[in-house]
Amino acid sequence: MRKLLLLIAASLLGVGLYAQNAKIKLDAPTTRTTCTNNSFKQFDASFSFNEVELTKVETKGGTFASVSIPGAFPTGEVGSPEVPAVRKLIAVPVGATPVVRVKSFTEQVYSLNQYGSEKLMPHQPSMSKSDDPEKVPFAYNAAAYARKGFVGQELTQVEMLGTMRGVRIAALTINPVQYDVVANQLKVRNNIEIEVSFQGADEVATQRLYDASFSPYFETAYKQLFNRDVYTDHGDLYNTPVRMLVVAGAKFKEALKPWLTWKAQKGFYLDVHYTDEAEVGTTNASIKAFIHKKYNDGLAASAAPVFLALVGDTDVISGEKGKKTKKVTDLYYSAVDGDYFPEMYTFRMSASSPEELTNIIDKVLMYEKATMPDKSYLEKALLIAGADSYWNPKIGQQTIKYAVQYYYNQDHGYTDVYSYPKAPYTGCYSHLNTGVGFANYTAHGSETSWADPSVTATQVKALTNKNKYFLAIGNCCVTAQFDYPQPCFGEVMTRVKEKGAYAYIGSSPNSYWGEDYYWSVGANAVFGVQPTFEGTSMGSYDATFLEDSYNTVNSIMWAGNLAATHAENIGNVTHIGAHYYWEAYHVLGDGSVMPYRAMPKTNTYTLPASLPQNQASYSIQASAGSYVAISKDGVLYGTGVANASGVATVNMTKQITENGNYDVVITRSNYLPVIKQIQAGEPSPYQPVSNLTATTQGQKVTLKWDAPSAKKAEGSREVKRIGDGLFVTIEPANDVRANEAKVVLAADNVWGDNTGYQFLLDADHNTFGSVIPATGPLFTGTASSNLYSANFEYLIPANADPVVTTQNIIVTGQGEVVIPGGVYDYCITNPEPASGKMWIAGDGGNQPARYDDFTFEAGKKYTFTMRRAGMGDGTDMEVEDDSPASYTYTVYRDGTKIKEGLTATTFEEDGVAAGNHEYCVEVKYTAGVSPKVCKDVTVEGSNEFAPVQNLTGSAVGQKVTLKWDAPNGTPNPNPNPNPGTTTLSESFENGIPASWKTIDADGDGHGWKPGNAPGIAGYNSNGCVYSESFGLGGIGVLTPDNYLITPALDLPNGGKLTFWVCAQDANYASEHYAVYASSTGNDASNFTNALLEETITAKGVRSPEAIRGRIQGTWRQKTVDLPAGTKYVAFRHFQSTDMFYIDLDEVEIKANGKRADFTETFESSTHGEAPAEWTTIDADGDGQGWLCLSSGQLDWLTAHGGTNVVASFSWNGMALNPDNYLISKDVTGATKVKYYYAVNDGFPGDHYAVMISKTGTNAGDFTVVFEETPNGINKGGARFGLSTEADGAKPQSVWIERTVDLPAGTKYVAFRHYNCSDLNYILLDDIQFTMGGSPTPTDYTYTVYRDGTKIKEGLTETTFEEDGVATGNHEYCVEVKYTAGVSPKKCVNVTINPTQFNPVKNLKAQPDGGDVVLKWEAPSAKKAEGSREVKRIGDGLFVTIEPANDVRANEAKVVLAADNVWGDNTGYQFLLDADHNTFGSVIPATGPLFTGTASSNLYSANFEYLIPANADPVVTTQNIIVTGQGEVVIPGGVYDYCITNPEPASGKMWIAGDGGNQPARYDDFTFEAGKKYTFTMRRAGMGDGTDMEVEDDSPASYTYTVYRDGTKIKEGLTETTYRDAGMSAQSHEYCVEVKYAAGVSPKVCVDYIPDGVADVTAQKPYTLTVVGKTITVTCQGEAMIYDMNGRRLAAGRNTVVYTAQGGYYAVMVVVDGKSYVEKLAVK
């Protein structure tokens, strides 16, 4: 947040600093607009402005200044000075005339000369996108610029525009600025207070019209009215349900049926008509008249249609020529009132055949019903500002950056936003194939294409985005011109089958740059300046993301058109006009669709078990704001909207009068639809299951439920008479086997003296009347000890004994016994120690306590409950049905029975297909079945091995770069992709679980709490948790340090944490929090390193309502990677105070599984270089570290596998003392490393260690886990070849295998070669890492193919580079290798262009003082200057010249190269004579240079340059080039030279032969400066010869050109740096291109954004001190002190002193015309 504030401050500090811009502070503290005292009679309004900004503008007509005010837009007569105005759309009552009275204002005059400002820019007309800016004349009214005095419009103006959907619309304009061009002065009227009265207003008629036409679907439009609060708020939609008028060509009747059925199910009341109806007709006039009548009739009945659907092409519904555009338009079908405002949302499903209409409908139905198999594409968006050298940097880039900044970002749920604000556009349209939910292009277009970057209608037909249909918007010319002779671009986009878009918004005529800008971001946006949400009216982007509106494709277009309406200037034809834009833009496809904004939410709903007949309404629970519809067979019965409590009252316009299944559909903007069926009729007597839940793991679905809440569904309650006045109640239950019964004895200390009861059962039923007396006690005194055992088979309790003082009794609680069903005698005894009697309980209950021949039925449970009854006691008996077969469960998936006869309350199904499924469970009783209870389940992934996503390929020079995204979902070897093991998922619906821990570290008594405070709502439900930095109820300011800690986790391989967070109050949003992981304990001290730490900023809250009103901020999803071994995760709220609450919800942790095992073979590494993808450290600093060796280069080497190994030397021609590290990439999760090593058999003591690091890759991060000194390896064993090198044989040992266990937490592995010297080498090959865990979704690697040949495998990164690729077209493919199989390949074509002009590399822009310094690297190869050149240099001799670069401009390079030409280790020398006087004397014209022995100074005396440098005139010399090459750099000029070949056998110093393309001896040869001459020796017949190649080596073979914000500011540069003076305070785009002789490279660009203004750290021409809170600045110039809001606090010359309040400040000093800015903090 601090950086953002400093950026703001830096822009405000521009007063007088630079000629580029300045800001004039006005006499108001803030810019503010208010509407108060709003009624049908009048309203009051105030307008205040805190600043005016001046911006320098370079034009074809010269240099001018542009003046702007936040929230205003430029106005003026064309060619006259342009000034800002504010425009508001207002609602005007029926019959009223709006009158404006100015109550007060302030006025000040400002001299622009004091700010170094030029004259104000003349206002220019709107420019069509079809215009060439270079050919459009610059409008300049000379008379206007000679006029003296202040000129401008009246302060206020009001103009009636028309009626829009029942609301009369007028434009209120405030003109706060007048301008005196001669004096160059502004007059600013500020703090304006006005009253707008409505004279003649008819309040009753106004409200009646509004009520009759109202629909919440027009909320987007109503919200743009300045005085919108005047109308009654309609919170319910069932009073005004959605109505749609459909007019279609007769040939589409059958094709339309599925769409009409769905719209009725969704809750649309349809009025459908066809052109073969006489009332409709086929002409434009008759169709228009019919539609107007339908609307007016509907309005009179308060049933006006919301949508108008036109179905067919112009052959059935023609449209008409626009009054302003002169192109085809559908506007006038829906503009009923005679103005240009439509009354209905109109869209055209343009199709020329029923088949094309079916294509459109199929895409719409899949999108609206959300039946696409993979919804993740909805989280992706494509945004393109197309190419235009003039307008792209002024409007295009700003449009796309606004969309990304405020909406299309992670905060709003987007995982991938493919943003192309400027070139290059490489691969941009490939994203349409891989899947995006939204695509927006703004720039040039044609009837059949988006122009640049180009995608044509033909290419649209070749798209491959099946099941991934999107909304497309084209802000460009004529792409929706639907009467074009062939299908226009928008028609093709929607008509194509199983690809393309479900809807397209575009313009029929040419569109305009300014209006398209306003259309997207809102009116008042200033060209060339990045717009802000606060500074613009509502545009189409803003409307799309209104949280609580019924956003449709049509409402997005309306918002754009209203923004253009905002910008139309009263009285001046300065813009193309709102009327033009209402005629221009159209929706092709289905405009009634509500687009999903990233991943839609899940609706929380509860449906009734059944729908009773003949009811006027039904109550259905759903998420607040949901639209609920009940229908049957495509006929709509009723609709309703869920209120704030989540209850929808569905008002039935057609009552249910018969049984059957009825469709219930629940929809809400950005929520998945709910599509269910409910049976109509009386409630079922058969109870269903309860608490049905469904979970998924991969493609396994697990259902769990609770048994029916009571088991009374088998029959009604039965009361059975069992004796005189005695009854028993029998009801369902379940516990025992079918042939058994259960008897339960229950008591609750009936007598209060701890005496209890016993139950005695006689299975022979012959004890009644003898052992069991008919009356009186069982016995008195002492009974026989075997009384019970001899007479009663079953006892309760089991140890009951015949003792009156017994403790074996049921006092409190219950006992039970299971008995065979049958006839028994029984009695219930009550031993009484005081009387010495064993009483039999009384008969005061519903059942006797003694019984002769009682039948206990099998399958029943008999509960005898003892109780007081008057002065005695008694027994109440309850009998329950205890049969296990009283019911079973049946399971359905998607309406199909998949399992029946279940008795358990759980069910699992594996291998379920990916997608959305409905699982239902019903209970089957003997006499009937219960209603189904259902649950929606989403199974992720697909049934194949998932491929990579979004593969792109690019080429620079001969280097190809591939990039891709990981497979969708997280596939595993099942082969079905598995989303991973969910370790924890918590939505806090029931508060903070007991297993979570909270710590109130600051001890204020306020920690994390469950979200049940007023106004707190969870992300996707009611529950969340929160922590306070300001407490309500008198608590006040808090300084929290609160921890919320998860239960213990098991994440051996790490995991991924996702959660949702928001600030409770969008206006007090700066809540600071962090996320930590601990691998040890869960105390606060265990959480030290934050994985994520941030402050939620107000700028981060992008919901329009959240900015405009104080409500809960926007929920944002965060994702954090958890390290291996994580045991606890903590959310810490701290470093916040005096804000409000931070809310947390939907915490989910998924465990990472096993990463794929992988083996490093070093086959992709290059001989003699450090191994690819490994890090090396030469810790001893001898310049000789680990490097790759190839057996193809070394005869003595044999790799373990393939050809390559890595090696480190302790002797390499000299003794070495190595300390070399070879470090792996991140191998988190590895448990073992297996590798092979070899050494020199004769010198085997090269010591090495295997080391691990759990942190970083510095040498100090590693510890030893294994080390050894190889010794005695394979003595006397095999040898693997001998070297031909001078140091003799290097016998290699056999390869030795080692496996080392790695400790938990290992992140990097290093092989260290050290503690040895003067031996030879150690080799490593085939290093294999075994990863821990079980196979999971991340268990895969990537394989890359070029032209069908595998070139790289085992990749784990999502990028790949290959250099040196041959010229031509290549197909690159990437496949995913899983444990169980491989994915389909994804492929991309890449072209290597030999004439490509290579660009610069690594361009950077950095501040330096007040300047911006650019630095870059030269092009990777300098062969772009021209084609290969062959030059004749003598008879039959040619030299090839091609580009290169190595030496300084006045020098040349000579290279001598050979490859053991004669096979005898004799080589060559190159001798150059700079005096060029040796030819014919020292250098003979023919024959050898000398024979025998030459003078030792022969070379030094005659030749200034030698190759090799130590060449000597000895025929036995070793100082020669045998294999390889040598070189020398010489001044460019004329030389004599010769190339010698010493031959010891003959004793001659031969001069090489002339068998090549260049003589080996030469008189006066010119070596040109800036060239490289390579002389390659070769055999030529019986002799030898020289082939010479000359390369252009001049550093000036190209120059650099620098651009700032699209304007060329420097060319002809040869250095790789450039300083742009005085530019560090503003944001700029810098570009550098390379200019070659034959062409120019692509530009490479970088955005420079100042961090505040660049800090000055050295040689500051001022002193700055802070003592306490006093800031003192001393300088020889001007000094100013600002706060971080840009307010100037103090200013003066030489010395400025200011006493601060604490916080951040900025000091600006201007000395000798140069500015310096420094930030400081005052505590």
From Swiss-Prot:
GO process terms (BP): hemolysis in another organism; proteolysis
Binding-site positions, Ca(2+) 2: 337, 339, 341, 343
EC identifiers of the protein: 3.4.22.47
Record PTM text: Proteolytically cleaved into a catalytic subunit and three adhesins. Arg-gingipain is involved in this post-translational processing.
GO cellular component, one term: extracellular region
Binding site for Ca(2+) 1: 313, 482, 491
Propeptide regions on this chain: 25-228
Keyword Manganese: no
Keywords: Calcium, Hydrolase, Metal-binding, Protease, Secreted, Signal, Thiol protease, Virulence, Zymogen
KW Protease (keyword) present: yes
UniProt protein name: Lys-gingipain HG66
Species for this entry: Porphyromonas gingivalis (Bacteroides gingivalis)
